[in-house]
């Protein structure tokens, strides 16, 4: 046997929740049981189990254990009553409370409970990118995303509130911007299942280590209905004055793609997955999410190439649902070989590729913050290009690859969209083909090449520096 070896435990230790090598065949069942328990309990996360060749080759049988008792691993399941009472007191005293919801609420599957809490407290809800969908995006109390590409109203709400009640949020730099100026008028309650996440980035007034759903249920149990009509009206006024908007450019309008997906999949139980880049932010801004429409993305990890393979996993895990992958032309090429997996597994995925011939998000930052010094972001660039390329366009060298031909090479089908008028009919046709033939499809949309994702707050800046 050809022997290959790498310290996979060392390589993955910093990116997995837990890693272990099984050295004894007799311990295999116990370790597998522990791995699944650790992965699913507390803050969910990946667990790697390394199986040496001799352990896999050794014959034998072992009964699968029914219980797990891991020394030193006791995920918190309760809610500290004293801290909870302090948090509720702040809610009752606040004139301008708001909820900041992160991905922890979605992981806890507490969307219904979160909606009830927002309605009972009568407070506006803003979300991180990972928290979007924790309350329906069409709910009147939902304001939008906070942070670098969040809405004006959501960021203004955080800037003006007197109580920020955060659940399942890490307060990363894309959310806070300049920490000294973040939520300057607010007391902060932070509920998170991971104690290390509390006060790590933002110092909070009331820390509560608890599962999101358990904490929300306790708050619902111990609070009376409240009203904040003037505050809600003020927040709604900001949203009306500074709504998200679309620019009309050549090619396909990127925001229109997302709104077309909302229309086409309105009556479908759908999982959307997103790659990383401008398209991810447009998806986070414009997708309508609720109990039957979910968005899966890699959040702060920022992994280009995430869209297609995560869609494969979503479709295998949820065969009864429609699954749509949203990618850019750069990110899609990082894992496009997974089309072969989707074809072989007969998965009816619809892959939407935003093709602007750019690594768009990096190019946007080069344009806005680096005096348009464009470097390695034009995907039409050829070695033979002359001089410094400042404004690549449709007359540049031929784009590589041809996504339609690539789909055909994988035994699938591709579609090419060059105008907004083609969007709805093409996506409907692609979905019908995918479902009828049990094959993935690619819908390549030629996006306006210089469209920017707005609003935007520069990294390390604050709300007062927002660009609309």
Set out the residue ranges of the language-model regions.
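Thiamine diphosphate
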Residues: 153-172, 281-361
